[in-house]
Curated annotation (Swiss-Prot):
SUPFAM superfamilies per the UniProt record, alphabetical: Terpenoid synthases
Organism expressing this protein natively: Chitinophaga pinensis (strain ATCC 43595 / DSM 2588 / LMG 13176 / NBRC 15968 / NCIMB 11800 / UQM 2034)
List of residues binding Mg(2+) 1: D82, D86
EC number per UniProt: 4.2.3.62
Residues annotated as binding Mg(2+) 3: N220, S224, E228
Chain sites annotated for binding Mg(2+) 2: D86
Name of the molecule in the record: (-)-gamma-cadinene synthase ((2Z,6E)-farnesyl diphosphate cyclizing)
Assigned protein family: Belongs to the terpene synthase family.
Site annotation Plays a critical role for abstraction of the pyrophosphate group: residues: G178
Cofactor: Mg(2+)
Keywords: Lyase, Magnesium, Metal-binding
Length: 321
């Protein structure tokens, strides 16, 4: 694996962290043990190094303890699903993966039990989420999860057929494969930010959500490109750029960083163009925007400072200061 220089990423937003982060980590490690995700001391040591609760605590800095645990468990579940796809080669078995995700959709839509570790744990999360969100919120969240699972099927089909997506295809699908739209929907129940549909669906708000998603996902692709290149997974913006343009890995990293930085500029510009929806709604919208900003910094801070998941400090990666 060649040595690559990672670009220095700086955001014009504050880095925050929830006061309940340590307690949420303890709850999260107990949760994965109780549901059977972790069965050995070695696996628990790896889990502790991943520090999943820190990502949730940075992204939702003002959430209460119960809400923080709920979203930390949810994001941990997503990582566990991702790992099981890798370990069981589930990510290459498109038809079987559809069967598995159909079970998860039945949990969401009908509260139908699924007697697996992933199924039982997802039911536990969904029961807590249902208690926090009304039916309108639940409908939005279910749609975001359905889109996420559909994007997983797309990736699995590509892997099974040895297809490398084009850059255009990848950029279109990447906001869904990261499941961040589900986390954005969760802002309402986790940080208690209540915005009516006409504000959430306003075209500037929608583009800000997409910009946040792109920034987070493309930064993640930079951090994880070495790991995914080793695993032979092409679903990474750096790697599809390298393939399509026949460039070096470093050139592809640099282009991904340029695209990422342009999206940050767009985000900050669009914030200034948001219309007023009245004093009360403007305050709620500012709280919503604050969580989007927190997600952007949370992803970077967690990836670089907290977790051992992406190994961004390995010798094959040099951070450019």
């Amino acid at each position: 694996m060649p040595t690559i220089t990672l670009p220095r990423i700086i955001y014009p937003f504050p880095s925050l962290i929830n006061q309940f982060v340590t307690a949420a980590h303890e709850q999260n490690r107990q949760w994965v043990a109780d549901f059977g995700f972790i069965t050995t001391p070695e696996a628990m040591a790896r889990f502790d190094r991943s520090r999943f609760a820190w990502l949730a605590a940075r992204a939702f800095p003002h959430a209460g303890f119960h809400e923080l645990c709920t979203i930390a468990n949810f994001n941990t579940w997503l990582f566990m699903l991702d790992d099981q796809c890798d370990e069981a080669q589930l990510g290459k078995k498109a038809v079987y993966l559809e069967h598995v995700t159909d079970g998860f959709m039945n949990i969401l839509k009908h509260n139908t039990p699924v007697d697996t570790v992933l199924g039982r744990s997802f039911t536990d999360i969904w029961e807590r989420m249902q208690a926090l969100g009304d039916t309108a919120w639940q409908t939005r969240f279910i749609r975001s999860m359905e889109e996420y699972f559909t994007s997983c099927h797309w990736e699995a089909g590509n892997r099974a057929a040895d297809i490398v997506p084009t850059v255009a295809e990848y950029v279109t699908m990447r906001p869904y494969t990261g499941a961040l739209f589900a986390d954005v929907e969760a802002i309402e129940i986790i940080e208690k930010v209540y915005l009516p549909a006409h504000i959430l669906q306003h075209f500037i708000v929608q583009r800000l959500v997409l910009a946040c998603n792109n920034i987070v996902c493309w930064a993640n692709d930079i951090f994880s490109c070495a790991k995914e290149a080793r695993q032979g997974d092409v679903h990474n913006l750096v790697l599809v750029l390298q393939h399509e343009r026949n460039s070096t890995l470093q050139e592809a990293v640099n282009e991904t960083a340029r695209m990422h930085n342009e999206e940050v500029k767009l985000f900050t510009a669009l914030e200034k163009l948001l219309p007023s929806f009245g004093a009360e709604m403007d305050r709620e919208l500012e709280r919503f925007m604050a969580v989007l900003r927190s997600w952007i910094t949370a992803n970077y801070d967690w990836s670089y400072h907290d977790t051992g998941r992406y190994q961004v400090k390995e010798v094959e990666v040099v951070i450019n200061s």
